[in-house]
Amino acid sequence: IAEIDLLDETEHAAIAAANRTTTALPLRDVAALLEETAKARGPLAAVRCGDRQYSHSDINDAANRVASGLRGRIGNGKSHPRIAICLPRSENLVIAILAVLKLGGHYVPLDPGHPAERRSLILEDCKPDIILVSEADDDAAKAAYPAACMAIEPLLRATGSFGHPHRETLPDHLASLIYTSGSSGRPKGVPLPPTSLVPLL
């Protein structure tokens, strides 16, 4: 009985076709994909946070402003900077991540709600070029790493014309360094390549 096939060849082919969900993804520069997405979907809603809504153009323009401010702080000598982002979940967190990717760098997410000891261990291990924080956040990082900390709000308030930084992110570069829970000891950084973000775009 186990060897009896309940479906004929046509039905097997139909099931196989219905479940063909693989998609060929382009090996593209993530920053360029972000820019193309913003142009294609400009006025459409990209981020909603509470009762606030931001279009793709709004988020892209803000990310370009932040990327420009970060570049001004780091200088042009460092092509792939490491930026720790310690921001609450909000539109500014999305903007910060996009800004770092546009800059050709990679980000290290830090949850401001996590214990200060965990955040200190991560910062000690990853040694970021900049720690992006909030003006309102009285964080231990500001006290421990005052020279590296930079508030995102002044960057967002900057006026002028800020275009795409045109920093290419190649497949062998890093996009993010995410730390494990550290349940077996110290948190360990897990590198993620830009290709892991392409399906989201």
Annotate each predicted stretch with a short phrase.
Residues 1-6, 21-196:
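Carrier-protein-dependent adenylate-forming modules in NRPS/ANL systems
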